[in-house]
From Swiss-Prot:
Compartmental location: Nucleus; Chromosome
Bias (Acidic residues) ranges: 77-95
Name of the molecule in the record: DNA endonuclease ctp1
Keyword Phosphoprotein in record: yes
Post-translational modification note: Phosphorylated by tel1 in response to DNA damage; promoting interaction with nbs1 and recruitment to DSBs.
UniProt-reported outcome of changing S35A: Wild-type phosphorylation pattern
């Protein structure tokens, strides 16, 4: 068994040699295929050139055949026009054509005229000419206006303006354009309010300090001291609880007595203390000073 396995095994040098031979064969085959590709490309270029030359020849031959056919048709038409019956008689010169103008006028006799009546014996020298209606061509009247060529290209607005008087034309051209302007091209928005389309919005206060909060909610608000109110209190001094500002009313005037103390008077001592949801900004220094500058 060992001898059989030894015989089946192949040395690595033999395998290496076989692989080298295969690689050489592949390289030779690749070189052969590349040479075939080069030859095929050359043949393809030659065939394309031959096809282009054949196409140009066909185009030139077709153009020459068309030109020759047109010339033949023109020659046929000219020969048909020359072979008109009675053309030999036309070539003969008419002796009356070469006659002078005075001799031609002598053959025409002018009938006598009367001062009040129309021409007499007009049928003697005027021959009625009968022309078939089919041969008469109706000619359209041409526009004698110097701007007639431009009138076909003008707009409807300009045609309406031309029908007006010159004075109206001047006023219209000075006050308004020839055509209405488009608002979208001017970049101006249409600010006209549409009635009934806008819904009524709920009222929203413009200022933050307009809200009024009372009761227990007011106690929960943050307290702050206003320096301006405190300064006002210091300048005017505290108001005594026992004293009340005199008021000139009917009771004082008649009875001469003094009014009882007001229950809101102790609150004056707490001036400068505030409670608000949104604390306002402080007033700048010197805002309330009204002294005249020297």
């Amino acid at each position: 068994m060992n001898e059989e396995e030894h015989n089946k095994s192949v040395h690595w040098s033999i395998v290496y040699r076989q692989l080298g031979n295969l690689l050489e064969q592949y390289e030779v085959e690749i070189a052969r295929l590349k040479s075939q590709l080069v030859l095929e490309k050359k043949l393809r270029i030659q065939v394309e050139k031959e096809l282009e030359s054949v196409k140009t020849k066909q185009i030139s031959s077709s153009a020459s055949s068309k030109v020759s056919s047109n010339t033949i048709q023109e020659l046929d038409s000219t020969t048909d026009e020359d072979e008109i019956p009675g053309s030999d008689t036309v070539d003969e010169e008419d002796p009356s054509l070469n006659a002078p103008f005075s001799e031609k006028n002598q053959s025409v006799k002018i009938p006598p005229h009367s001062p009040t009546l129309p021409v007499q014996n007009a049928s003697a020298f005027v021959k009625p000419i009968s022309v078939p209606l089919g041969n008469v061509k109706e000619e359209k009247f041409l526009d004698t206006n110097p701007i007639g060529a431009e009138s076909f290209e003008s707009s409807d607005g300009e045609m309406h303006l031309r029908a007006r008087s010159p004075e109206d034309m001047i006023l219209l051209r000075e006050t308004q354009p020839l055509a209405p302007l488009d608002i979208n091209t001017l970049g101006v928005s249409d600010n006209r309010q549409k009635k009934g389309t806008e819904k009524k919005r709920p009222f929203e206060p413009e200022f933050l300090n307009d809200d009024v909060i009372r009761g227990n909610k007011r106690k929960a608000l943050p307290a702050y001291e206003c320096p301006d109110c405190q300064k006002f209190y210091e300048l005017h001094g505290p108001v005594k609880e026992s004293s009340v500002a005199p008021t000139w009313n009917d009771e004082n005037r008649l009875g001469g007595g003094s009014l009882p103390n007001c229950k809101h008077q102790p609150l004056v001592q707490k001036v400068g203390r505030h409670r608000k949801l949104n604390i306002p900004k402080p007033i700048p220094n010197g805002f309330w000073e009204s002294d005249f500058v020297d």
